[in-house]
């Protein structure tokens, strides 16, 4: 297996680099550069170790350069962003992540982390936590161990344990504070307890004295995803006022704001934002789908929408939403036999989605499968996710059938 072979070689490189560092070899800096130069591997973690090494030998300026260059590739990386802030804090004596490659215990702890991470990716969470606990014993003050353990507990529905760890992580620095706040909100939503996730994150966001563009973007996304569309637009706009088209956030922010505008029926603004998002980053399957489907629903640009959706389907194969949109475009073009094939596949991929089942029912009706169409419409009425507007439409079709012009 090529992947296993490559991972093994990477572990060998890490071991070699840490060995040079442990013995204070003159080649240590060169070894770190070799380790982090492989473009096929996410080397953000080892960029941290490289910068941390340079800082430990008094080369703070070089350490900062490594961090800045790495953040261009991995702008949201947690450990690098916190390290950058730690180095800016002149009063800080102890860094938030304690790692010393001249300490054999710390080096061994990192290899236990590599094993733990590999086990977690294979959904072997108990084994992952076993290796993490060994790593934490050898290096108790390295936050990556806590982050992975909290994720493992979350994935195994041990929400209280996960939340307790995130609360501890949140006290370790401003980047960790916001990261932990977002994770705790996810837990609160899962728990369905009295504590309001919206209020919780609002209170946490308010405590950040000068939110950066990423924190503003995260908060805007959270508001949009919780149907607070007008509020989200305010924060998306704040981000857009601080960045240009070259910033990697630009297509994400214009997409997010475009969706929010569409949801409050400000279509011209929505369309402009979605087009701007695609202008900068044309390979976004879900943005292509959102814009095309919106056009189809308005009865405009349907042929163009179909081409966009076929492109989206090439980028993101077997996605139920995209396949449904292709079927719906064909339906609107009165290509009913083709539409039925796509909509049938969409239902197989997303059997509990009310809109997709409704579309398939319409398609069956237009292909003269009237009994089967009624079966699917009745099924839509029995789905608890079906909103009132769709319920009314389906009830009308059950009484009078599907009008070919609709």
Q: Where on the chain are the PLM-derived regions?
A:
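Alpha-helical solenoid repeat scaffolds
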Residues: 1-164, 171, 175-193, 211-228, ...
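Hydrophobic/aromatic packing residues within the alpha-helices of TPR/SEL1-like helical repeat arrays
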Residues: 32, 67, 132, 166, ...
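Conserved structural position within tetratricopeptide repeats
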Residues: 37-38, 72, 136-137, 170-171, ...
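Flexible internal linker/loop segments at domain or repeat junctions
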Residues: 97-102, 305-309, 315
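Feature representing long, continuous alpha-helical segments
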Residues: 268, 289-290, 307, 328, ...
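C-terminal soluble interaction/assembly domains
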Residues: 297, 304, 315, 332-334, ...
């Amino acid at each position: 297996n090529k992947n296993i072979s490559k991972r093994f070689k990477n572990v060998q490189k890490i071991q070699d680099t840490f060995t040079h560092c442990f013995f204070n070899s003159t080649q240590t800096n060169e070894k770190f550069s070799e380790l982090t130069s492989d473009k096929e591997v996410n080397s953000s973690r080892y960029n941290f170790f490289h910068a941390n090494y340079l800082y430990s030998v008094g080369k703070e300026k070089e350490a900062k350069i490594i961090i800045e260059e790495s953040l261009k590739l991995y702008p949201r990386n947690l450990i690098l962003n916190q390290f950058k802030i730690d180095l800016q804090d002149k009063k800080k004596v102890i860094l938030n992540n304690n790692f010393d490659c001249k300490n054999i215990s710390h080096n061994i702890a990192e290899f236990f982390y590599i094993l733990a991470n590999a086990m977690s990716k294979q959904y072997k969470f108990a084994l992952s936590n076993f290796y993490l606990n060994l790593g934490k014993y050898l290096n108790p003050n390295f936050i990556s161990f806590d982050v992975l353990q909290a994720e493992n507990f979350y994935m195994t529905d041990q929400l209280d344990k996960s939340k307790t760890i995130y609360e501890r992580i949140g006290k370790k620095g401003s980047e960790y504070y916001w990261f932990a706040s977002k994770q705790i909100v996810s837990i609160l939503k899962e728990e369905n307890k009295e504590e309001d996730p919206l209020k919780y994150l609002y209170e946490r966001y308010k405590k950040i004295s000068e939110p950066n563009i990423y924190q503003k973007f995260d908060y805007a996304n959270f508001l949009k995803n919780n149907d607070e569309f007008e509020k989200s637009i305010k924060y998306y706009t704040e981000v857009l006022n601080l960045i240009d088209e070259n910033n990697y956030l630009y297509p994400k922010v214009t997409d997010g704001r475009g969706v929010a505008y569409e949801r409050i029926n400000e279509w011209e603004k929505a369309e402009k934002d979605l087009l701007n998002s695609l202008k900068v980053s044309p390979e976004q399957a879900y943005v292509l789908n959102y814009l095309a489907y919106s056009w189809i629903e308005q009865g405009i640009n349907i042929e163009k929408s179909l081409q966009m959706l076929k492109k989206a389907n090439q980028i993101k194969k077997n996605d139920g939403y995209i396949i449904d949109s292709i079927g719906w475009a064909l339906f609107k073009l009165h290509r009913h036999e083709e539409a039925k094939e796509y909509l049938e596949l969409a239902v197989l991929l997303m059997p509990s989605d009310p809109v997709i089942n409704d579309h398939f029912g319409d398609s069956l009706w237009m292909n003269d499968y009237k009994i089967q169409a009624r079966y699917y419409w009745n099924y839509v009425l029995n789905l608890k996710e079906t909103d009132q507007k769709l319920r009314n439409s389906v009830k009308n079709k059950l009484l009078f059938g599907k009008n070919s012009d609709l």
